[in-house]
């Protein structure tokens, strides 16, 4: 915490150069400081599910929370508030004043690369979860920068794509989560998106800023996404306060020239500088640590475990196969995710965790006397797993010259694995635009045989083992999707190795600009990156046979697989909803011999196809669960946690069923949001398409009974007076548990095309066995309103409305109704 300063005094005292310097960052994470006026540098930090700190490379470890869709699946305001507090506390430990989150874009397609970062396909649920996590974070003094405003709902050509969306869909679906934040949370900062909306980049569009500041009366600091500023004059005049990161590419001396040419007014510079100073004045009072460090307290671990367990969705549980008993003679654990948990997606969400609990280790804790058989069954990785536990004495040395020339060592950095991102790395004397590095280390395999190696790079790289070249990813390169869409495909090589023998590995690396690969529409963060992975070469058919044998011999089988950050990441979208190759075949083969005693655990941030689902008795959706992934899953499997989570998005049976299937790529620089307002369950219900699992679905180990009648008061609704819907619920099952009652509103008499029904409220209710409660859910003016494109206002239409209480969007258990006597138009929040 620094000394306070008076914004007016500083603004009136500083030079024009200082005012201009305030409008852009100084480096990857910090704003400009004016020490003589007590204006400190403000530190920002990623990411949506954790706090990385200031380093992508060799960073300080951090708490990794479950991913956005997992948080959304809790439908738990209080738990999200606690998650926000933890994120704020992590920021303070890292010396950061501003958390770059949460992400509240919409999953209009299950294929969006960052779909796992956002909370839900429904704007009400998304906005409500965002409100809770923001208020939690900002209660610590840390400012939340909600993102990405607006329309960055897919990664394909995200900097260049023109999102073509109707005003109604923009308002009702994509802007509404931000509108809820503006009304209920007032986060101190907002980040713009990379993309265009209807012909103009959001960052340069005055109309998009007017919605925030004039219509919603919300005045956050507005910053660009990283390298998401494209002009000097247009972005300044439109309303962008802060260009990130620094050093500036479009401000600085360019602003001076624009002012001299009277293309930017002095008053505009003063307005933007004032906003940055107000941001700094507030943020600097957060009690941030002077030294970047971690915390990893027992209470943090307990909270993370609670969040993970409460996020896990029980999709299917025929004949109450779950929960499993804790007295089991022999259990088979199958799948690479059993020992290598998927704790997060890729990109900004990826960080160095304090620790990661595997399902294997968690089950050993629960079943200390049980014989446990483990088989991989099939690989789920896209890139070979990074070398870590078999790596020793590894360092990276940095130079300004390539390896074939005489060169001067600039720095030496110890590393504990063979993956690195250097977008924000710097050391004295380093030429950031063009440099080279050498990674040296010792690799001691634990099994003899043929080992596969894979090398992916943003830049150039060559792998040597005992000075023999094994992979050349320098001479000829093929573009892939890694490293925010700028990397190569994985080039592979193989070498016969002996267990226990130590081999010298060496990677000769050239920074980003040594690569000839160019790409349109992706973000060029610079620096470069590389990923070296290794795995014992295995016969895939024999792996399946071994898994089948284990399942046939065990009393129970847990098959845990899915996606990971190789498949779901910032920088690219998925091409399909498929699980990794051979996974479906593995699951089918295991179900053939042990279907009556097998539980399928899927880890993914968004839906995957499950062609075997009708044959599986029990299916669990475990998302990306953070540090406590293994514990969270085991808690649900063995009944220590009664599952209560609900899907925050619809789960289509086939990728071709999803509403954005024909419009999920940038074509000719444009992407048509052809589904309009019919996103997610709104689409499936409108056309009568059955999903594999509906929005809001999730089972429990207990039973609930809800009174069939909803009492609505008052029965005549106006936009000035919210109404209340009251219903009774009882836990009629054998154990305590929670049910999430979802309130949908339908407008059957409306002359305007509308969804069959829309989520407008919810309540998570915890009940002991036999306990009964009265639940009251409030409904506000959003429930009866749609965006009138002719009047350019919200319209609450006269008519009869139905209140539908469901345990999912498909399972409606109670009904009521109310009327709106008079049509009303309104604006604002």
UniProtKB/Swiss-Prot annotation:
Catalytic activity: Hydrolysis of terminal, non-reducing beta-D-glucosyl residues with release of beta-D-glucose
Molecular-function annotations in GO: beta-glucosidase activity
Catalytic site positions: 225
Family: Belongs to the glycosyl hydrolase 3 family.
Gene name of the record: bglH
EC identifiers of the protein: 3.2.1.21
Domain PA14 residues, every copy: 389-548
Highest taxon of the lineage: Eukaryota
InterPro entries listed in its UniProt record: Cellulose_deg_GH3 (IPR050288), Fn3-like (IPR026891), Glyco_hydro_3_C (IPR002772), Glyco_hydro_3_C_sf (IPR036881), Glyco_hydro_3_N (IPR001764), Glyco_hydro_3_N_sf (IPR036962), Glycoside_hydrolase_SF (IPR017853), Ig-like_fold (IPR013783)
Protein's pathway: Glycan metabolism; cellulose degradation
Organism whose genome encodes this protein: Aspergillus clavatus (strain ATCC 1007 / CBS 513.65 / DSM 816 / NCTC 3887 / NRRL 1 / QM 1276 / 107)
Assigned keywords, A-Z: Carbohydrate metabolism, Cellulose degradation, Glycoprotein, Glycosidase, Hydrolase, Polysaccharide degradation, Secreted
Function, as annotated: Beta-glucosidases are one of a number of cellulolytic enzymes involved in the degradation of cellulosic biomass. Catalyzes the last step releasing glucose from the inhibitory cellobiose.
Sites where a glycan is attached: 416, 431, 473, 602, 627
Record's protein name: Probable beta-glucosidase H
Localisation: Secreted
Family matches, as SUPFAM superfamilies: (Trans)glycosidases, Anthrax protective antigen, Beta-D-glucan exohydrolase, C-terminal domain
Major location (coarse): secreted
One Pfam family this sequence matches: Glyco_hydro_3
GO cellular component, one term: extracellular region
GO BP terms in the entry: cellulose catabolic process
Enzyme class: hydrolase
């Amino acid at each position: 915490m620094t000394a306070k300063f008076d914004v007016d005094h500083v603004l009136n005292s500083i030079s024009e150069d200082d005012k201009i310097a305030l409008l852009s960052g100084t480096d990857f994470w910090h704003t400009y400081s004016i020490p003589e006026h007590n204006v400190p540098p403000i530190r920002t930090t990623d990411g949506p599910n954790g706090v990385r700190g200031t380093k992508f490379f060799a960073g300080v470890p951090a708490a990794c929370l479950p991913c956005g869709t997992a948080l959304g699946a809790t439908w738990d305001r209080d738990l999200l508030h606690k998650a926000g507090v933890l994120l704020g506390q992590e920021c303070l430990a890292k010396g950061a004043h501003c958390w770059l989150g949460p992400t509240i874009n919409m999953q209009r397609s299950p294929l969006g690369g960052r779909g796992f970062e956002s909370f839900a396909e429904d704007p009400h649920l998304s906005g409500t979860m965002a409100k809770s996590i923001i208020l939690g974070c900002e209660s610590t003094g840390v400012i939340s920068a909600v993102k990405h405003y607006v329309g960055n709902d897919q990664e394909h050509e995200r900097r260049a794509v023109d999102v073509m969306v109707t005003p109604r869909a923009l308002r009702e679906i994509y802007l509404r989560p931000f509108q809820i934040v503006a009304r209920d949370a007032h986060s101190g900062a907002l980040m713009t998106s990379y993309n265009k909306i209807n012909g103009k980049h959001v960052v340069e569009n005055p109309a998009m800023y007017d919605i925030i500041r004039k219509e919603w009366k919300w005045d956050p600091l507005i910053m660009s996404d990283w390298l998401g500023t494209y002009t000097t004059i247009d972005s300044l005049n439109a309303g962008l306060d802060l260009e990130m990161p620094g050093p500036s590419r479009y401000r600085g001396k360019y602003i001076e020239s624009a002012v001299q040419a009277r293309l930017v007014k002095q008053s505009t510079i003063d307005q933007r500088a004032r906003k940055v100073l107000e941001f700094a004045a507030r943020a600097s009072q957060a009690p941030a640590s002077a030294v970047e460090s971690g915390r990893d307290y027992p209470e943090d671990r307990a909270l993370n475990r609670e969040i993970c367990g409460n996020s896990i969705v029980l999709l299917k549980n025929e004949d109450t196969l779950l929960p499993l008993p804790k007295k089991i003679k022999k259990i088979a654990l199958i799948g690479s995710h059993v020992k290598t948990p998927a704790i997060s997606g890729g990109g900004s969400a990826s960080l160095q965790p304090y620790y990661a609990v595997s399902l294997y280790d968690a089950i050993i804790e629960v079943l200390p006397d049980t014989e446990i058989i483990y088989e991989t069954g099939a690989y789920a990785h896209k890139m070979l797993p990074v070398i870590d536990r078999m790596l020793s004495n590894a360092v990276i040395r940095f130079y300004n010259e390539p390896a074939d020339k005489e060169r001067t060592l600039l720095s030496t950095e110890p590393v504990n694995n063979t993956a690195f991102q250097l977008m924000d790395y710097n050391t004295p004397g380093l030429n950031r635009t063009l440099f080279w590095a050498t990674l040296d280390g010792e690799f001691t395999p634990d099994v003899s045989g043929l080992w596969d190696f894979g090398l992916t790079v943003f830049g150039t790289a060559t792998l040597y083992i005992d000075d023999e070249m094994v992979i050349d990813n320098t001479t000829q390169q093929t573009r892939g999707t890694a490293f925010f869409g700028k990397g190569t495909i994985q080039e592979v090589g193989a070498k016969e190795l002996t267990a226990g023998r130590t081999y010298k590995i060496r990677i000769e690396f050239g920074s980003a600009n040594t690569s000839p690969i160019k790409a349109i529409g992706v973000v060029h963060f610079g620096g470069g990156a590389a990923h070296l992975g290794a795995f014992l070469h295995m016969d895939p058919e024999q792996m399946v046979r071994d898994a089948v044998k284990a399942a046939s011999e065990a009393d129970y089988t847990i098959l845990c697989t899915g996606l990971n950050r190789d498949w779901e990441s910032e920088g690219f979208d998925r091409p399909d909803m498929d699980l990794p190759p051979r996974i479906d075949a593995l699951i089918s083969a295991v179900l053939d011999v042990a279907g009556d005693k097998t539980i399928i655990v899927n880890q993914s941030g968004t839906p995957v196809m499950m062609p075997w689902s009708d044959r599986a008795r029990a299916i669990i959706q475990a998302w990306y669960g953070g540090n406590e992934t293994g514990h969270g899953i085991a808690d649900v499997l063995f009944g220590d946690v009664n599952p209560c989570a609900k899907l925050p998005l619809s789960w289509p049976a086939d990728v071709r069923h999803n509403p954005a299937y024909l419009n999920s790529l940038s074509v000719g620089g444009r992407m048509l949001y052809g589904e309009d307002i019919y996103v997610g369950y709104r689409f499936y219900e409108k056309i009568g398409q059955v999903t594999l699992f509906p929005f809001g679905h999730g089972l429990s180990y207990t039973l609930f009974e809800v009174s069939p009648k909803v009492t609505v008061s008052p029965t005549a609704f106006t936009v000035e007076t919210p109404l209340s819907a009251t219903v009774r619920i009882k836990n009629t099952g054998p154990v305590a548990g929670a049910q999430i009652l979802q309130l949908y509103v339908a407008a059957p008499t409306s002359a305007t095309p509308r969804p069959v029904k829309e989520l407008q409220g919810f309540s998570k209710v915890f009940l002991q066995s036999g306990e009964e409660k009265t639940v009251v859910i409030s409904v506000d003016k959003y429930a009866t309103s749609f965006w009138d494109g002719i009047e350019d206002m919200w319209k609450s239409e006269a008519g009869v409305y139905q209140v539908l209480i469901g345990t999912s969007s498909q399972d409606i258990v109670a009904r009521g109704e109310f009327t709106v006597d008079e049509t009303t138009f309104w604006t604002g929040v």
